[in-house]
Design a protein with these regions (language model features):
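Positively charged
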Residues: 1-188
Length: 188
């Protein structure tokens, strides 16, 4: 395991002791804003809240969570495809897709900010992603499959894009109306 993976794992392990942050639900305005780049002076605050973000993601349960989903308009996100007893956390600061395959793959997606809503989304099958880790080191990884989908989904959040934006207008509107109805029933 690399030093970066050990650091990410240690931060994720602290989630067991952290109170989960509330996850915003669409149509919250923060979810539609493009985030600002994380600067070195932001890192102390980010390190402080990361365990609570992991806690929220694991409790939901989810495999990815972006800062806007917890009300922060900053460019960072978490992913973890591992099982509870074998976590594989990745903390991505200022991530970007730097290359993508021409081959596309369709995969069913959901989102913690659109609870109980799912749809098949077509994205590049393989991507190369660059990001900074919490120590400021530049990371780069070529990924495919579910991890590629998850990373692209979380990076979309940092651009103010939801998975439903990749669907037809009709399908997107059906999902958003259904979500609004479910949220209204939940409040009453």
């Amino acid at each position: 395991m690399t030093n970066a993976a050990l650091t990410d794992a240690a931060i994720a392990a602290a989630a067991a002791e952290a109170a989960p942050m509330p996850i915003l639900v669409a149509p919250h305005a923060v979810l539609r804003r493009k985030t600002r780049e994380v600067k070195p002076e932001d890192m102390a605050e980010i390190r402080r809240i990361l365990p609570s973000m992991f806690s929220a993601m694991y409790e939901a349960p989810g495999i990815g969570l972006a800062a806007p989903q917890v009300g922060l308009s900053l460019r960072f996100a978490l992913v973890d495809l591992g099982e509870k007893d074998a976590r594989e956390p990745i903390i991505m600061i200022n991530p970007e897709v730097v290359a993508e395959s021409e081959t596309l793959a369709a995969r069913e997606e959901g989102c913690l900010s659109l609870p109980n809503q799912y749809a098949e989304v077509t994205r590049p099958e393989q991507v190369r992603v660059q990001w900074r880790n919490v120590d400021g080191d530049l990371m780069e990884r070529e990924v495919d499959g579910l991890l590629a989908t998850c990373m692209q989904h979380e990076i979309d959040h940092l651009e103010g894009v939801l998975f439903v934006d990749h669907l037809s207008t009709l399908r997107r509107n059906m999902i958003l109306r259904r979500l609004a109805k479910e949220q209204k029933m939940k409040r009453s």
